[in-house]
Amino acid sequence: MVRWLYSTNAKDIGTLYLIFAVFAAMIGTAFSVLIRMELAAPGVQYLNGDHQLYNVIITAHAFVMIFFMVMPAMVGGFGNYLVPVMIGAPDMAFPRLNNISFWLLPPSLILLLASAFVEQGAGTGWTVKCKLSQIIIMFVSIYNLLNITRCGKLLYSEMNTHSVLTYISTMFNDVKMSSTWGQSAWILYKIIIPRGITYIKLVVGVLSYTMYKVYTYSISLFYVVYNSVSFNKNPSETQRNVFSSGRGVNNSTNFKEWLVGITDGDGTFYFAKTKKGIWSFSFQIGQSNYNIRLLYYIKSMLGIGSVSVTHAKDNTAHYRVRNIQHIIQYILPIFDTYPLLTSKYFNYDLFKKAILIMNDSSLSNQEKDEKISYLKSQSLPDNYISPAWNNVNNQVTSILDAMSVMTKSWLIGFTEAEGSFYIVKKGPLRLVHAFEISQKLDHIVLEAIALILDIKVTTKKTYMTVVTTNYKSIENIISYFFKTMKGMKALEYRIWARSFNKKGSGRFEYMTKIQNLMRNIRSIRLDKNFTKK
C-alpha cells in the first residue's frame, strides 16, 4: 500500500494511470449505454422525461472518456511507462509532482460523477463551451453548405496554406448545433471580409493563421432563417429561458404576466355569429410571420391552441384558441388573475360574459342568442380605463403607483408587441439610438411606462407615444430589457444594444450599417411555400 500511495517511480505511477484509465473507461461505457438506451426508440425510454439528467449524462460521458480515460492512459500511462521503456529514457523529472498529479485524479472523477446527478445543476449538455452556454447562442454564426461551397470557389484561385487553415478553423469553430436550447428557431449567417491583405482576396472566418496583421471591417451579411423545431412542454435548464425551466410558481407567474402584456398589445378577444347562425369564439394573438417563433413559444407554454399562416402573402401569423372549454379552463383564469391594463379589458369582459352565457346549460338557445347579441352591440366608452388601475384611483403620480399595477413581465410582453428599438438620424453625420412605444388610447398606460423607464410622454395629433434618444435613458432601457424578450424583438434589441457603445472614428458608417441591418431583418418574410399550421 505504501508503495502505491507514496511511490515516485515512474513505472509505478504509469501503472496506476493505466488502471485508473480502465476504471474510468468502464464508467464512461456505462454512461454511453444509458445514452444509447434512451435513443434506441422514439419517445421517453428510461429517464422518465428528465431532460436535465440526460444533458448532464452526455456531458459527463464526454468528460470521463476524454479527460479520465484517454488522457491518463496516453499521457500518464504511455508517457510514464511505455515510452521511456521503448526509447531507453530515464524516469521523468519532478517525481513527487508526478505522484501528486495522479492522486488528484480520483477525487476529480468523484466530484464530476456527483455533479452529473445534481438535478438543479447547469446541465450544459452540448453547450460546454462557455461561448455557447450564453443567450447569444440563439444568434451563433453558422455556415451552411451553400456558403461553404461558394466561399471555396472564391478562394480556389488563390488557395494557400493560410486560407486552408482558416477555412478548416471556420468549420470547426463556427459550425455548431443551432437547436441546443430545444427552442432555437433562428440561425445567423455571418461572413467577415478583411482588407489590407495583398496575397488573398477573401478569408472566411474570424481566426487568422498568419504572421501578418489582418485588419478587418465588419461588413457582415446576416440571414435569419426559420427552422422548424419541436418544443418541449417541460424544457430543460439548458434552454436558459427568461422563464427558466418552465416549472415553479414564479416562472408561471412571469409567463402569464408576459402573456397579458403581449395580449394588451397584439391580442384579440373575438366572438361573432357565423352564416349558419352559430356563435364562434376565439382568443388570438397576431404577429408578423417573421416573428412566428413567438407564437410557437406561447403555444408550447400553454399547451393548447394552434399557430397558422393563412397565406404567406398576408405577412401575418396567428395563434388561436377556439375550443370553448379550453378558453374557460386555461385562458380566462389567466386574465382574471392578471387583468389587462389597456382598454382591451372592455372587449375581454364582453368576451368572458358571452362565453359563459354560451356555456350556461340553464339557458335556451334563443336566450343565449339574445344575450350574446346584446353584448356584441356594445361599444367602447370614451376615455375608458381598465379596472386594473382602480388601485391607484386611475391616476399614476409616482413610480410606486406605476409598479404597483404594471409588472416588469407585463411591460416586457407589451414591448414585444408595441415597442420599437431603432436608430434615427439626428444630423447630417449623426445617428443615435431611439426607443418608442405608441398608443392611440390608454394614456394612463403610457404614463406608467414613462415613469418606470424614466422617459416622457409625447402627444401627437392622432396618437400618444413614449419616445427617447437621451443617452442616459437609452442606457437604462438597455439594462432593463437585457435578456428578457422571447421573439424576434430579442434579436432586434440585441443588435441595437450591442452597437450602443461604439465610439470614435467610423461611428457614423458603423451606425449606418447597423440601421440597414435592422431594416433588412424586419423585412424578412416566410417563404411563399410555407403552409404550416
From Swiss-Prot:
Query: Would the keyword Metal-binding be found if you checked this record's keyword annotation?
Result: no
Where are the residues of the annotated region COX1 exons 1 and 2 encoded?
A: 1-128
Provide the protein's localization. Mitochondrion; Membrane
What topology does the record note for this protein and the membrane?
Multi-pass membrane protein
Gene3D superfamilies, sorted: Cytochrome c oxidase-like, subunit I domain, Homing endonucleases
Its Gene Ontology cellular component terms are: mitochondrion; respiratory chain complex IV
> What does the UniProt PTM comment say about this protein?
The mature protein may arise from proteolytic cleavage of an in-frame translation of COX1 exons 1 and 2 plus intron 2, containing the aI2 open reading frame.
Enzyme Commission no: 3.1.-.-
Q: What is its main location?
A: mitochondrion
**One annotated GO biological process:** aerobic respiration
EC class name: hydrolase
User: InterPro entries given for it?
Assistant: Cyt_c_oxase-like_su1_dom (IPR023616), Cyt_c_oxase-like_su1_sf (IPR036927), Cyt_C_Oxase_1 (IPR000883), Homing_endonucl (IPR027434), LAGLIDADG_dom (IPR004860)
Q: Which family does it belong to?
A: In the C-terminal section; belongs to the LAGLIDADG endonuclease family. In the N-terminal section; belongs to the heme-copper respiratory oxidase family.
Q: What is this protein called?
A: Probable intron-encoded endonuclease aI2
Q: Which organism is it from?
A: Mycosarcoma maydis
The organism's lineage is: Eukaryota, Fungi, Dikarya, Basidiomycota, Ustilaginomycotina
